[in-house]
Amino acid sequence: MVKNIARGGARWLDVAPGRFPRWIASFAERHGDGPPGSSLAITVTSADVIYTAPDGAIAKCFPPFWESRVVLPAYGDPPPAGEAARAIAGHALADRAVGVLLVRLGGYAAGVFTGSPPVLAVHKTGSRLVHGRSAAGGWSQQRFARRREKQASEALKAAAGTAAEVFGRWAEGAVRPGDEERAAGRQPRAGGTRGTGLDVVVFGGDKRAVAEASADPRLAPYAELATGRFLTVPDPKLDVLRDAPRLFLAIRILLTEPPA
């Protein structure tokens, strides 16, 4: 579980889906006066699920790939807190094809994850030289800046091209199970949304670099699949890409405790 401090004394937590139902039960035990989950008020919106305890504690939860009408249609309004937590966890862990593109200046990684838990089915990483900023002045600095701008542009085009290649291979069914997939008995699947073979696309790395790379026309078919969640990662090497499911599956919680 990852913790970060938010404004106003609130805290951001990242909770793995498998731990989420128990986390909600513990939240109820700490802040309620009845059986776990029974004392919590719950509000479901198109963006989040808010649990409010009798003592004023609030857990504002942002599940990944959230579709409230799909996940909680059968539980009434509002749904029971414990059942909702289990449904949210199940939805997060559902088998889906997730395209991932991680970009920082000079480095990039693209891949497709599938299965539950997600397995990296196809991937490609790369790097391009992008010089750091120069402290020199005058014409020398201007020439260096132009060279650096060209290097950065070429690197981001390479990142977009790599993602288009990887996602395209998946959509065309050209991917065959690797060792990990064979061990799990999984096969790549075509279909997805709008024939892309993907259900959702997640970006991460440097926001400015990702914004430019994702605007490349070759990635236009995937624009509508992009989620609002952005993955904060270091240089996108293969091990960083493999760790992406831990980030894109986490249920983000903004926890506000009552005054002491």
Model-derived features: positions:
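Terminal alpha-helical anchor/extension segments at protein ends
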Residues: 1-260
